[in-house]
Amino acid sequence: MDKLLELYQQAVDKMLCYFTPILLLFTRLWVASIFFKSGYLKITTWDSTLYLFEEEYQVPLVPWELAAYMGTAAELILPIFMVLGLFTRPMAAALFMVNVTAVISYPVLWEGGFYDHKLWGLMILLNVVWGAGVLSTDHLLKKRFFK
């Protein structure tokens, strides 16, 4: 029985060696796509974005105009780092905060879009906890400079 459990554990470990990097890459690309598209929409319809931040969104602690600039910049810049897998943990943590802020600031999301934000939050947290994995610039830099 011990031999069977050991073989099972070895098989699972081997499978995870291949599956985990693909999962981490998938989550990075998926979340980056969602947030970049959101930032792109904000910047291409800037007047509407300013209106929404002034009238609809209830961003705490930050003036609405600053929140519009910061939110749009974060949604355009952070996904680039996620795609590259560069400085993944801090960039993912920042993107997680953008996601949390979106949920807090726009209560209308709680009815229909909250599920999506929870899913994105979990995908982002995978990268905060595990890092970007071997399919990333972080891994290449680590191999190059921290042998």
Question: Which role fits each region the language model picked out?
Answer:
Residues M1-T44, V62-A73, I77, L84-K147:
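Extended, low-polarity transmembrane helix blocks
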Residues T45, T49:
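Extracytosolic helix-loop segments that constitute the early lumenal/periplasmic catalytic or substrate-binding loops
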Residues L50-V62:
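Perimembrane loop-to-helix junctions flanking transmembrane segments
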